[in-house]
Protein backbone atom coordinates (compact mmCIF):
# COMPACT_ATOMS: atom_id res chain seq x y z
CA UNK A 1 0.00 0.00 0.00
CA UNK A 2 1.01 3.60 -0.56
CA UNK A 3 2.03 5.74 2.39
CA UNK A 4 1.08 9.40 2.60
CA UNK A 5 3.81 12.02 2.71
CA UNK A 6 3.39 12.73 6.43
CA UNK A 7 3.61 9.02 7.27
CA UNK A 8 6.84 8.76 5.27
CA UNK A 9 8.23 11.79 7.09
CA UNK A 10 7.38 10.35 10.51
CA UNK A 11 9.05 7.09 9.59
CA UNK A 12 12.17 8.97 8.47
CA UNK A 13 12.18 10.90 11.76
CA UNK A 14 12.05 7.65 13.72
CA UNK A 15 14.94 6.17 11.76
CA UNK A 16 17.13 9.24 12.26
CA UNK A 17 16.35 9.34 15.98
CA UNK A 18 17.19 5.63 16.27
CA UNK A 19 20.49 6.03 14.42
CA UNK A 20 21.49 8.98 16.60
CA UNK A 21 20.57 7.20 19.83
CA UNK A 22 22.37 3.97 18.91
CA UNK A 23 25.19 5.51 16.84
CA UNK A 24 24.18 3.12 14.08
CA UNK A 25 23.97 3.06 10.30
CA UNK A 26 21.00 3.36 7.98
CA UNK A 27 21.81 1.37 4.84
CA UNK A 28 19.68 2.33 1.85
CA UNK A 29 19.80 0.21 -1.33
CA UNK A 30 18.83 2.59 -4.14
CA UNK A 31 18.81 2.68 -7.92
CA UNK A 32 21.58 4.93 -9.24
CA UNK A 33 19.36 6.68 -11.79
CA UNK A 34 16.50 8.74 -10.40
CA UNK A 35 15.91 7.15 -7.01
CA UNK A 36 19.21 8.25 -5.43
CA UNK A 37 18.75 11.84 -6.62
CA UNK A 38 15.14 11.85 -5.42
CA UNK A 39 16.19 10.63 -1.97
CA UNK A 40 18.89 13.29 -1.66
CA UNK A 41 16.41 16.05 -2.50
CA UNK A 42 13.79 14.67 -0.10
CA UNK A 43 16.31 14.47 2.73
CA UNK A 44 17.59 17.99 2.04
CA UNK A 45 14.04 19.33 2.12
CA UNK A 46 13.27 17.65 5.46
CA UNK A 47 16.51 18.98 6.97
CA UNK A 48 15.82 22.50 5.66
CA UNK A 49 12.33 22.40 7.16
CA UNK A 50 13.70 21.24 10.50
CA UNK A 51 11.77 17.97 10.28
CA UNK A 52 14.86 15.77 10.70
CA UNK A 53 18.35 16.36 12.03
CA UNK A 54 21.16 16.15 9.47
CA UNK A 55 23.25 12.99 9.61
CA UNK A 56 26.37 12.32 7.55
CA UNK A 57 25.13 10.90 4.24
CA UNK A 58 27.40 8.91 1.95
CA UNK A 59 26.34 8.33 -1.65
CA UNK A 60 28.39 5.24 -2.41
CA UNK A 61 27.71 4.59 -6.07
CA UNK A 62 30.04 5.74 -8.87
CA UNK A 63 27.19 5.53 -11.37
CA UNK A 64 24.89 7.58 -9.13
CA UNK A 65 27.61 10.22 -8.84
CA UNK A 66 27.97 10.40 -12.63
CA UNK A 67 24.21 10.55 -13.13
CA UNK A 68 23.95 13.30 -10.53
CA UNK A 69 26.53 15.32 -12.47
CA UNK A 70 24.31 15.03 -15.55
CA UNK A 71 21.33 16.26 -13.51
CA UNK A 72 23.41 19.24 -12.34
CA UNK A 73 24.34 20.20 -15.90
CA UNK A 74 20.76 20.30 -17.16
CA UNK A 75 18.57 22.40 -14.85
CA UNK A 76 16.45 23.26 -17.89
CA UNK A 77 14.96 19.77 -17.55
CA UNK A 78 13.86 20.25 -13.91
CA UNK A 79 10.27 20.72 -12.89
CA UNK A 80 9.31 24.19 -11.67
CA UNK A 81 9.85 23.50 -7.95
CA UNK A 82 13.29 21.93 -8.46
CA UNK A 83 14.35 24.74 -10.78
CA UNK A 84 13.39 27.33 -8.15
CA UNK A 85 15.45 25.44 -5.58
CA UNK A 86 18.42 25.25 -7.96
CA UNK A 87 18.35 28.96 -8.76
CA UNK A 88 17.66 30.18 -5.21
CA UNK A 89 19.59 27.73 -3.04
CA UNK A 90 22.25 26.36 -5.36
CA UNK A 91 23.02 22.71 -6.08
CA UNK A 92 19.96 20.65 -5.01
CA UNK A 93 22.14 17.55 -4.67
CA UNK A 94 24.80 18.96 -2.34
CA UNK A 95 24.99 19.88 1.35
CA UNK A 96 27.70 20.04 4.00
CA UNK A 97 26.54 16.66 5.37
CA UNK A 98 26.42 14.87 1.98
CA UNK A 99 29.50 13.21 0.53
CA UNK A 100 29.80 11.37 -2.78
CA UNK A 101 32.11 8.36 -2.47
CA UNK A 102 34.16 7.40 -5.50
CA UNK A 103 37.14 5.18 -4.70
CA UNK A 104 36.84 1.56 -3.53
CA UNK A 105 39.17 2.43 -0.64
CA UNK A 106 36.83 5.11 0.67
CA UNK A 107 33.87 2.76 0.25
CA UNK A 108 35.64 0.13 2.35
CA UNK A 109 36.36 2.69 5.07
CA UNK A 110 32.62 3.21 5.50
CA UNK A 111 32.38 -0.34 6.81
CA UNK A 112 34.84 0.48 9.58
CA UNK A 113 33.19 3.78 10.45
CA UNK A 114 30.88 4.20 13.42
CA UNK A 115 27.46 5.77 13.07
CA UNK A 116 25.24 7.61 13.07
CA UNK A 117 25.24 7.91 9.29
CA UNK A 118 23.27 7.07 6.18
CA UNK A 119 24.79 5.03 3.35
CA UNK A 120 22.92 5.17 0.04
CA UNK A 121 24.33 2.63 -2.42
CA UNK A 122 23.30 0.57 -5.41
CA UNK A 123 22.08 -1.78 -6.59
CA UNK A 124 18.50 -1.09 -5.60
CA UNK A 125 17.56 -4.76 -5.28
CA UNK A 126 20.82 -5.72 -3.52
CA UNK A 127 21.88 -8.07 -6.29
CA UNK A 128 25.26 -6.44 -6.86
CA UNK A 129 27.21 -3.27 -6.34
CA UNK A 130 28.65 -1.73 -3.22
CA UNK A 131 25.49 -2.06 -1.17
CA UNK A 132 26.06 -5.81 -0.88
CA UNK A 133 29.40 -5.16 0.83
CA UNK A 134 27.73 -2.75 3.26
CA UNK A 135 25.07 -5.34 4.01
CA UNK A 136 27.74 -7.97 4.57
CA UNK A 137 29.40 -5.79 7.19
CA UNK A 138 26.27 -4.28 8.74
CA UNK A 139 23.45 -6.79 8.58
CA UNK A 140 24.42 -8.64 11.76
CA UNK A 141 24.33 -5.52 13.94
CA UNK A 142 20.88 -5.24 15.49
CA UNK A 143 21.31 -1.47 15.91
CA UNK A 144 21.56 -0.94 12.16
CA UNK A 145 18.62 -0.30 9.87
CA UNK A 146 18.12 -1.38 6.26
CA UNK A 147 15.71 1.05 4.60
CA UNK A 148 13.96 -0.34 1.52
CA UNK A 149 12.82 2.48 -0.78
CA UNK A 150 12.00 0.69 -4.03
CA UNK A 151 10.36 -2.35 -5.56
CA UNK A 152 12.11 -5.67 -4.91
CA UNK A 153 11.65 -8.39 -7.51
CA UNK A 154 11.14 -12.04 -6.65
CA UNK A 155 14.22 -14.10 -5.78
CA UNK A 156 16.39 -11.03 -5.08
CA UNK A 157 18.22 -10.33 -1.84
CA UNK A 158 16.12 -7.20 -1.48
CA UNK A 159 12.87 -9.22 -1.64
CA UNK A 160 14.17 -11.64 0.97
CA UNK A 161 14.90 -8.72 3.28
CA UNK A 162 11.39 -7.35 2.74
CA UNK A 163 9.94 -10.79 3.46
CA UNK A 164 11.80 -10.87 6.77
CA UNK A 165 14.18 -13.75 6.22
CA UNK A 166 16.29 -14.34 9.33
CA UNK A 167 19.16 -15.75 7.27
CA UNK A 168 19.95 -14.40 3.80
CA UNK A 169 22.60 -15.33 1.22
CA UNK A 170 25.29 -12.67 0.82
CA UNK A 171 28.03 -13.54 -1.67
CA UNK A 172 26.69 -17.10 -1.49
CA UNK A 173 27.17 -17.35 2.27
CA UNK A 174 24.13 -17.80 4.58
CA UNK A 175 24.26 -14.73 6.81
CA UNK A 176 22.11 -14.07 9.90
CA UNK A 177 20.08 -10.88 9.65
CA UNK A 178 19.88 -8.97 12.91
CA UNK A 179 19.50 -5.47 11.47
CA UNK A 180 15.98 -4.06 11.36
CA UNK A 181 14.36 -3.80 7.91
CA UNK A 182 12.09 -0.80 7.33
CA UNK A 183 10.08 -0.54 4.11
CA UNK A 184 9.06 2.84 2.68
CA UNK A 185 5.98 2.39 0.50
CA UNK A 186 4.86 5.19 -1.75
CA UNK A 187 8.19 6.05 -3.38
CA UNK A 188 7.72 3.95 -6.50
CA UNK A 189 8.36 5.69 -9.80
CA UNK A 190 6.15 3.20 -11.67
CA UNK A 191 2.49 3.48 -12.52
CA UNK A 192 0.27 1.17 -10.46
CA UNK A 193 -2.50 -1.12 -11.69
CA UNK A 194 -5.18 1.58 -11.77
CA UNK A 195 -2.86 3.98 -13.59
CA UNK A 196 -2.09 1.36 -16.24
CA UNK A 197 -5.76 0.55 -16.76
CA UNK A 198 -6.51 4.26 -17.11
CA UNK A 199 -3.65 4.58 -19.60
CA UNK A 200 -5.10 1.85 -21.83
CA UNK A 201 -8.55 3.48 -21.65
CA UNK A 202 -7.08 6.81 -22.73
CA UNK A 203 -5.35 5.54 -25.88
CA UNK A 204 -7.20 6.76 -28.97
CA UNK A 205 -7.81 5.05 -31.23
CA UNK A 206 -7.88 1.97 -29.02
CA UNK A 207 -5.06 -0.49 -29.77
CA UNK A 208 -5.92 -3.82 -31.33
CA UNK A 209 -3.29 -5.63 -29.29
CA UNK A 210 -1.66 -5.04 -25.88
CA UNK A 211 1.41 -6.77 -24.45
CA UNK A 212 1.78 -6.88 -20.67
CA UNK A 213 5.51 -7.00 -19.92
CA UNK A 214 8.07 -5.98 -17.27
CA UNK A 215 6.22 -7.50 -14.34
CA UNK A 216 6.04 -10.62 -12.21
CA UNK A 217 3.97 -13.42 -13.73
CA UNK A 218 1.10 -13.46 -11.23
CA UNK A 219 0.57 -9.70 -11.33
CA UNK A 220 1.03 -9.55 -15.12
CA UNK A 221 -1.62 -12.22 -15.67
CA UNK A 222 -4.00 -10.41 -13.32
CA UNK A 223 -3.49 -7.09 -15.09
CA UNK A 224 -3.89 -8.76 -18.48
CA UNK A 225 -7.19 -10.29 -17.36
CA UNK A 226 -8.41 -6.90 -16.12
CA UNK A 227 -7.56 -5.24 -19.44
CA UNK A 228 -9.30 -8.05 -21.33
CA UNK A 229 -12.43 -7.68 -19.19
CA UNK A 230 -12.60 -3.95 -19.89
CA UNK A 231 -11.82 -4.37 -23.60
CA UNK A 232 -13.32 -7.68 -24.84
CA UNK A 233 -12.35 -7.02 -28.46
CA UNK A 234 -8.71 -6.35 -27.69
CA UNK A 235 -6.01 -9.02 -28.01
CA UNK A 236 -4.19 -9.00 -24.66
CA UNK A 237 -0.95 -10.99 -24.46
CA UNK A 238 1.19 -11.80 -21.42
CA UNK A 239 4.28 -13.15 -23.22
CA UNK A 240 6.01 -16.25 -21.94
CA UNK A 241 9.73 -16.02 -21.32
CA UNK A 242 11.84 -16.10 -24.51
CA UNK A 243 8.79 -15.86 -26.76
CA UNK A 244 9.13 -13.78 -29.94
CA UNK A 245 6.45 -11.66 -31.58
CA UNK A 246 6.51 -9.82 -34.89
CA UNK A 247 4.71 -6.50 -34.72
Regions found by a protein language model. Name each.
Residues 1-247:
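Acidic/His-rich, metal-assisted hydrolase cores and their charged scaffolds
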